[in-house]
Amino acid sequence: MAVTPEDLRYTEEHEWVRRIGPTRVRVGITDYAQSQLGDVVYVQLPDEQREAAAGESIAEVESTKSVSDIYAPLAAKVVAVNEELSNAPETLNADPYGAGWLFELEVADAAALDVTLGELLDAAGYQGVIGG
């Protein structure tokens, strides 16, 4: 069964979102997603300072099985990317909720972020999506 930490929010596209500041979140793929992908061999990260629309494809993860788009879970600016994945894409498989994070997004308004995060799935809701 896939690990689904209670302190994160989730999308139906198998991404997790962790608030790391009043207006900032960190994004990655879930344990379920990495297990479905198989061995990750390449990660294409978004450009820093890029403005992303909610639901927009902004990154790609390539595995031995397939290539998967990664979507922005909310409208925001990309403010950091995990450069370590360029040299060690397998980190996504080994530690999807820690060292395998993909990028960080920042919004202008903390209250709006509260609302947006509230609209994402909690751990139980995500377990329902993956049949857990």
Curated annotation (Swiss-Prot):
GO cellular component: cytosol; glycine cleavage complex
A Pfam short name: GCV_H
Residues of the Lipoyl-binding domain: 24-106
SUPFAM superfamilies associated with the record: Single hybrid motif (SSF51230)
Described purpose of this protein according to its UniProt entry: The glycine cleavage system catalyzes the degradation of glycine. The H protein shuttles the methylamine group of glycine from the P protein to the T protein.
PANTHER family the record matches: GLYCINE CLEAVAGE SYSTEM H PROTEIN (PTHR11715), GLYCINE CLEAVAGE SYSTEM H PROTEIN-RELATED (PTHR11715:SF3)
Oligomer status and interactors: The glycine cleavage system is composed of four proteins: P, T, L and H.
Protein name, as recorded: Glycine cleavage system H protein
Gene: gcvH
